A protein has these predicted regions:
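Structured-RNA-binding interfaces characteristic of tRNA pseudouridine synthases
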Residues: 1-244
């Protein structure tokens, strides 16, 4: 039976995250519902990266097994799906391909704007406070050297493994905005927001670089967080020629 990979993007504002949950509106549930309408049969999708409630994605993937799809599958699915979910591509891969386990890394961006702008309020955090960007860059460099992130995951996580391999951790600054970019092999629930919030505390000099560094060695959860609407999953990276 063919294995299909679906690439999609979505605005996470109205959803309780990516993964299907009971009594909750999720990205997976919407795509599975649209599939049932189009194909007349139900499937269970496997996702690459399980974004949290309110988090957006420029790129994410599902895979599923099915015999024969509608000849205008993407067009018809996009017509059925809500306007805030878009299917971008579909590929047929070998039966052992896996959208979650074969992904090498995921990249997230947390977007912040410093000057009030009503057109950005749903897609970035308004943060008008004075910040020491150099200190925040130091904190981002520290993150790049770490691999144990227990203090930076939500308390109700079911995770047993708190190790993540970092590939990128940096701030990009512009005149009226800044963006934190982080890439790793995997992420814990709420991790990017907790890290970003902690660095903002460093930037405001509410905590020192030394205190920030010590959080990683603590056996308790970090006490800082920020809203989800500024967070984007931007890339899910697979091996070269994976889709060829």
């Amino acid at each position: 039976m063919p294995r299909y990979f679906l690439e999609l993007s979505y605005k996470g504002t109205n959803y309780s995250g990516f993964q299907k949950q009971e009594n909750a509106n999720t990205i997976q549930a919407e795509v599975e519902k649209a599939f049932l309408v189009l194909q007349g049969q139900s499937i269970t999708l496997i996702g690459s990266s399980r974004t949290d409630a309110g988090v957006h994605a420029l790129q994410n993937y599902f895979h599923f097994d099915y015999e024969e799809l509608h000849p205008q599958f993407l067009y018809k699915m996009n017509a059925i799906l809500p306007e805030d979910i878009a299917l971008k591509k579909i590929n047929i891969l070998p039966a052992n391909a896996h959208s979650r386990f074969d992904a090498l890394s995921r990249r997230y961006e947390y977007r912040i704007y410093r000057k009030k702008n009503p057109f950005l309020q749903n897609f970035a955090l308004y943060y008008p406070f004075k910040l020491d960007i150099q200190l925040m860059e130091e904190a981002a460099t520290i993150i790049g050297t770490k691999n144990y992130f227990f203090p930076f995951c939500k308390t109700n996580t079911q995770a047993k493994n708190f190790n993540c391999t970092m590939y990128k951790s940096q701030w990009v600054t512009k005149e009226d905005s800044l963006m934190y970019i982080i890439e790793a092999n995997r992420f814990l629930r709420g991790m990017v927001r907790l890290l970003t919030a902690s660095m903002l505390q460093v930037g405001r000099k509410k905590i020192s670089i030394e205190e920030f560094n010590r959080i990683f060695d603590a056996n308790e959860k970090c006490g800082f967080s920020i809203p989800s609407h500024g967070l984007f999953l931007t890339h899910v990276n697979f091996p070269n020629a994976y889709f060829n």
